[in-house]
Amino acid sequence: MNTKSRRLNQTLVLALAMAGATPLLAQSQARMVSPEQIQSYWLMLNTKVDADVPNSGRNMDKPGCVAVSYMIGSDGVPQNVTVRKVVPQSDLDAVAKSVASNFRYGPSLKNSSHEPVNTYFIVPFNLPADAAQRQSIISACKLPGYDQA
């Protein structure tokens, strides 16, 4: 094999490798957006989501929350849905993950390019009527690092 064709082969291999890595790079470089700022990029289309809640389990009747992180892809569908925090520890993590997985988003007017973003959602369970107590529980599930709007 001569030098010219060897260089061409190396260039083609490098180009193919870069093309395969592009979606992964885009995902890892997606902007981190807090739940309070998500409406600047994406609008939730389905405000009601069904979830199967088990009849029994650990701390199922206690007030609590689950923080679930995910990336909203360019198609408005959550990807890489991950349970990040459960307060108090309970068996509601799978319920929260299924809820977030079923969200669907449409781009905001500012996001006409359908820019993917990383965000999270706090799924509350059995919250008390008192506003201060509710806020205390929700605050325990906030995740750091999502303040870059």
Locate predicted features.
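Bacterial N-terminal signal peptides
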Residues: 11-21
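Short proline/glycine- and basic residue-enriched helix-capping loop/turn segments at helix->loop/beta transitions
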Residues: 28-69, 95-148
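Bacterial N-terminal signal peptides that target proteins for export
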Residues: 2-13
